[in-house]
From Swiss-Prot:
It is found in: Cytoplasm. GO terms for molecular function: ATP binding; UDP-N-acetylmuramate-L-alanine ligase activity. It comes from Shewanella loihica (strain ATCC BAA-1088 / PV-4). PANTHER family: UDP-N-ACETYLMURAMATE--L-ALANINE LIGASE, UDP-N-ACETYLMURAMATE--L-ALANINE LIGASE-RELATED. HAMAP family: MurC (MF_00046). It is an enzyme of class 6 (ligase). This is UDP-N-acetylmuramate--L-alanine ligase. The gene is murC. The lineage of its organism: Bacteria, Pseudomonadati, Pseudomonadota, Gammaproteobacteria, Alteromonadales.
Length: 484
């Protein structure tokens, strides 16, 4: 067996180091995507530093790995850097960006750095409006089970690995491809996955859905002529663009014309069972440790990629069956005894109407007898404005709704696109009387009067609601007002 040190030495001969680059500085290092790329780079031996406005689990992990972490932004923090990597959330007036420009230090977006990592590897890039993180995690798990030892960069915590990024010793790199700013066009993978295409981040595409679709076509044409596009044919927009793709295409879905087709879907609580049919191969009866039809589609993408790479079926079966999930993707935080009775707490990152609808459907299918109580935090005023009617329709489908204020993500408020407006519009439908929660602290007094024994309490959104959900779990859903 080759020793670890020898394996890394072999890896360096395949993947050349970036010329002249010794120290890399990240601005906005605490984000999952930025932190994942940073973790791979620090493990490759680069000197790493980074800044963000607050500490979190990502910055703490990077600090343990030896990165220099600064809280707050200051011009002197880029001193000595050979390149500065910026997140899409960073404004051009940031003092570190201005200082880098003054010093003629190259400034690159995170996707450009990811592309550099992928340049000499066998890249698998996962794009789409929804399901990227879960699909990327499933592919990484299958490749790990098959002992392919991949490098991966994921937008969420892969529970089995305890991290969202890892430097492997093979030629494989599996990563999410971010369409939010069209920066996924920097990537040149060997395999590209498109899970679905819906209207989101439309400011990037000047409000033009045709431009968004064309950008996905361009992304798939970044594949070499011997590359493979793996596409969900159940999605109508993906199906629509397929005739424009001049590369080999493998389709997946529940549709009869899918190359990798799911049959006999059945949800059993947190897990899903289904049969996979592939042309010229034996059917596979599978269980994936994830709930919902949408997660079966994510699993099909992983199966399609693995099958194309001739990974044995046994590794696919084991990886899906033993999958331990991803942080904040229908993550069950526990069942707690409250004064009202037993309450199950689940946390989910979904923040687009289609994602919220899929989460609600999975909850209803897996736990049909439970009342569904949702605490929802809208993410970005622009998204709330652009998809307002869709949000009103989907949020009205729960049994009890508590709406936190919009998590702005740095955006200025948009009149008529806030949580108070959503409450009014949902109430006018006559199905539900939502509760507006101006400050998260108010949940201490509101929840005891809302929860009932047997409820499924779902915290939903992409802002800081994940931290709130963990606080609720840490407190065991016990509230100060109950003990007074």
């Amino acid at each position: 067996m080759i020793k670890t040190e020898e394996k890394y030495a072999q890896l360096r001969t395949i993947i050349p180091e970036m010329r002249r680059v010794k120290r890399i500085h990240f601005v906005g290092i605490g984000g999952a995507g930025m932190g994942g790329i940073a973790e791979v780079l620090v493990n490759e031996g680069y000197r790493l530093s980074g800044s963000d406005i607050a500490e979190n689990a990502v910055t703490a992990r990077l600090k343990r790995l030896g990165a220099a972490i600064f809280i707050g932004h200051s011009a002197d923090q880029v001193e000595g850097a050979d390149v500065v990597v910026v997140s899409t959330a960073i404004d051009a007036s940031n003092p570190e960006i201005l200082a880098a420009q003054e010093r003629r230090i190259p400034i690159v977006r995170r996707a450009e750095m990811l592309a550099e990592l992928m340049r000499y590897r066998h890249g698998v890039a996962v794009a789409g409006t929804h399901g990227k993180t879960t699909t990327t995690s499933l592919i990484a798990s299958v490749y790990g089970q098959a002992e392919r030892d991949p490098t991966f960069v994921i937008g969420g915590l892969l529970n089995s690995a305890g991290t969202n990024a890892r430097l492997g010793k093979s030629r494989y790199l599996i990563a999410e491809a971010d369409e939010s700013d069209a920066s996924f066009l920097h990537l040149q993978p060997m395999v590209s996955v498109v899970t679905n295409i819906e209207a989101d981040h439309m400011d990037t595409y000047e409000g033009d859905f045709e431009k968004l679709k064309s950008t996905f076509v361009d992304f798939l044409h970044n594949l070499p002529f011997y590359g493979v596009a793996v596409a969900c044919i159940d999605d109508p927009v993906v199906r629509e663009i397929l005739p424009r793709i001049g590369r080999k295409v493998v389709t997946y879905g529940f549709s009869e014309d899918a190359d990798v087709q799911a049959l006999n879907f059945e949800q059993q609580g947190y897990s899903s069972r289904f049969t996979v049919r592939r042309e010229g191969m034996a059917d596979l009866d599978l269980r994936v440790n994830l709930p919902g039809r949408h997660n079966v589609l994510n699993a099909l993408a992983a199966i399609a990629v693995a099958t194309e790479d001739e990974i044995e079926d046994e590794a696919i079966i084991r990886a899906l069956d033993e999958f331990q999930g991803i942080g904040r993707r229908f993550q069950q935080l526990g069942e707690f005894t409250t004064t009202a009775g037993e309450v199950m707490l689940v946390d989910d990152y979904g923040h687009h109407p289609s994602e919220v609808a899929a989460t609600i459907k999975a909850a209803r299918s897996g736990w049909p007898d439970k009342r569904l109580v949702m605490i929802y935090q809208p993410h970005r005023y622009s998204r709330t404005r652009d998809l307002y009617d869709d949000f009103v329709e989907v949020l009205a489908q729960v049994d009890c709704l508590l709406l936190l204020d919009v998590y702005s993500a740095g955006e200025a408020p948009v009149p008529g696109a806030d949580s108070r407006a959503l409450c009014r519009s949902i109430r006018q439908r006559g199905q539900l009387d939502p509760i507006f929660v101006a400050e998260p602290e108010q949940l201490q007094t509101i929840l005891p009067g809302v929860l009932q024994g047997g409820d499924l309490l779902l915290t939903q959104g992409a802002g800081n609601i994940g931290a709130l959900s963990r606080q609720l779990a840490d407190a065991g859903l016990q509230f100060e007002s109950e003990n007074q």
